């Protein structure tokens, strides 16, 4: 079963909170609320990157797969994200590190129409599988 939900937004800081709320509603609707925390963390980082670095309108897409959720963020900036070495005293640069920690896999690729697609897949068990 594959379900999906999409949000298109302007590059405003409010879009990060709007995206978090979408994750919460969607994960509950999909009976996957046990995975809400890692999916929310990844969405917040990828959307914040789109808002801060791309500064273009973006599209967030959540896709439910068998036991996982795929997060996709498309924007119009061609620069791909980089996983940097974590610097303990740095004020930034932790976004993709967090994505790398939470996701079973992630990547970024140029979009055919320009810009890029950044994606992450997160293993998530349905609530019934965890409870029983």
Describe the function of each predicted region.
Residues 1-6, 51-132:
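Conserved beta-strand-loop-beta-strand hairpin that lines the nucleotide-binding pocket
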Residues 6-20:
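STAS-typified acidic loop motif
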Residues 8-11, 31, 91:
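Pocket-edge positions in alpha/beta enzyme catalytic cores
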Residues 9, 25-28, 38, 64-69:
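Short, functional N-terminal and low-complexity linear motifs
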Residues 17-44:
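Conserved short strand/loop->alpha-helix "switch" segment adjacent to the catalytic nucleotide/phosphoryl-transfer site
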Residues 48:
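Short active-site loops of ABC-family nucleotide-binding domains
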């Amino acid at each position: 079963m594959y379900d999906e939900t999409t949000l298109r937004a302007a590059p405003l800081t409010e879009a990060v909170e709007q995206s978090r709320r979408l994750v919460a509603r969607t994960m509950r609707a999909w009976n996957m609320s046990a995975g809400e925390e890692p999916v929310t963390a990844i969405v917040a980082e990828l959307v914040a990157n789109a808002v801060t670095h791309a500064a273009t309108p973006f599209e967030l897409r959540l896709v439910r797969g068998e036991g996982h959720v795929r997060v996709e963020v498309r924007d119009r900036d061609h620069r791909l994200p980089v996983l940097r070495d974590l610097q303990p005293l740095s004020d930034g640069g932790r976004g993709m590190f967090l994505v790398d920690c939470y996701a079973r896999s992630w990547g970024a690729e140029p979009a055919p129409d320009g810009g890029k697609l950044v994606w992450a897949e997160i293993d998530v068990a349905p609530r019934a599988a965890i409870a029983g």
